[in-house]
Amino acid sequence: MAYEDLREFIGRLEDKGELARVKHEVSPILEMSEVADRTVKAGGKALLFERPKGYDIPVFMNAFGTERRMKLALEVERLEEIGERLLSALEFRPSSFMDALKGVGMLKDFMSFIPKKTGKAPCKEVVAESLDKFPILKCWPKDAGRFITFPVVITKDPETGEMNAGMYRMQVFDGKTTGMHWQIHKHGAEHFRKMAEKGGGKIEVAVAIGVDPATLYAATAPLPSGISEFMFAGFIRKERLKVTECETVDLLVPANAEIILEGYVRVDEMRVEGPFGDHTGYYTPPEPYPVFHITHITHRENPIYHATVVGKPPMEDAWLGKATERIFLPILRMMHPEIVDINLPVEGAFHNLAIVSIKKRYPGQAKKVMYAIWGTGMLSLTKIVVVVDDDVNVHDMREVVWAVTSRFDPARDVVILPPSPTDSLDHSAYIPNLAGKLGIDATKKWRDEGYEREWPDVVEMDAETKRKVDAIWNEIRNMVL
C-alpha cells in the first residue's frame, strides 16, 4: 500500500522503531544540523524535532539516512526491484540508456500512472503570509543564511508544456523571495533558458515541501526530458499520485504535500546566492542565480517541515544516491551487457568516481566501458572511472585497491580526456562546469593488449579444503573471533 503522504511514512518509521522524537528545544539555526550530522554518521534513526526553538512547526530530518529506511521509503526489499520492473516493461531493445528510459515512458504500463487530479487538497488547508513562520534551517556556520533543502521544484517547458519536478536548494532572502539554485545541467534551468530565448518575462514555479517519499525520490532521479517525475513516482508507488491545481500559477502540485509555495522567476533578474555547505564537503562559493518571487503560500493543518543537511559525506543524501545507483543498474546492464556491477562511492559525492566491474571478453573492453559511462546521461559528468574484472567486488574498497595496485600500469592503462562537462559543484575544475576526466583500466591484461607475460593465478584455497573447514568452522570461530 503506497504512502498517501509524508505523515504515513513517518508513522511507518515509528512502527518499525526507526523514528526518534526529539523533545528537547533545538534551534533550526545550526543546532539541528549538528544533531542530524552526528546521527546519520552513526547510522541512527530518523529525527522528528518536536520543539524547534522559536517555532511551533516540527522538523523532520534524516528520513533516508540508512539503507533500511531507503527501502522502507520506496517500499521494496531490494532497491534493484524498481529498475527490474522498468526493464521488464520494455518491449524493444533501445539504442541508448536515455532511449530506454524514454521507451519506458511510452509504455501502457507506465502511462497508467498519470497523476490523478483532485480538488480536495490537504496542502491548501491554511493560507500563510510569509516564509517566516517555517523553521527553515541554517545548516553550517558560513552559510549565507537559511536554505530550503528538500524542495520539489515544479516548472513547465515553455515549448512543450511538459512539467518537470526537480530538487534545487533555495536560499531564503526574505519572507517572499528565495534563490533558485538550478544548475546548468538541470531541467529547471533548461526551462528558464527557453523562456529567456522566447523573450518571455518570467517562468511560473511551484514548490512542494514535505511530500511522500516516492515523489521526493523521483524529483532527484536522472530522468530524461519528457518523462514525468510524477508518473515515475506513481510507478514506484504502484499507485497514481494525487495532484491539485495551484491557485496563482498554471501548475500541478502533490495534493498531500505539507507546504506549497507558488510564484515566478524573472528571466532578467539574478541575485548572489551562497555560500552553502554542500554535499561535496565544501562550501559552494557565492554565485548569481535566479530569484523566486512567492505569490501564494499554503500548508496543511499542523504542518511538518521536512529538511535535510548535506556536507562532508556520508550524509543522508548518500542513500538517495545509492537508490539511483541500484535502480538504474538493470537498464545500464541491458545497454552494456558486459557490466556486472557499479559502485558510485559516497565519499566521491557520486559524480566524482565510478567503479565498474565487467565480464571481459575482448581486448580494450575496459576502455569501451569507460567511454560508455561518459556517454550515458548524468554519468557523463563522472570525473574518474575505474574498471575492474568480475572477480572484484566493487563495493569492497579493499578488493578495489588490490585490483588497481596489482592490475594497473600507469604508463599504459590510463585514459585521460581533455576538459569535458563536469558537475557544477566540482571545485577542482579550473573553469566552472569543465574539467578533465580519468579512466583507470584495472582489469587483467591479455597478450592481445600488449601484455607479454603469463598472468599469474590468484591465491585462493581449493574447494575440498574449504568444505572440510566449513564443517568445523562454527566451533572454531567461537574460539578465535
Curated annotation (Swiss-Prot):
Which NCBIfam families does the UniProt entry name for this protein?
mena_SCO4490, UbiD family decarboxylase
UniProt-recorded name of the protein: Uncharacterized protein AF_0209
Q: Which Gene3D superfamilies does this UniProt record tie to the protein?
A: Single helix bin, UbiD C-terminal domain-like
Q: Name one GO molecular function term.
A: 3-octaprenyl-4-hydroxybenzoate carboxy-lyase activity
The terms describing its cellular component in GO are: cytosol
Single GO BP term: ubiquinone biosynthetic process
Protein family: Belongs to the UbiD family.
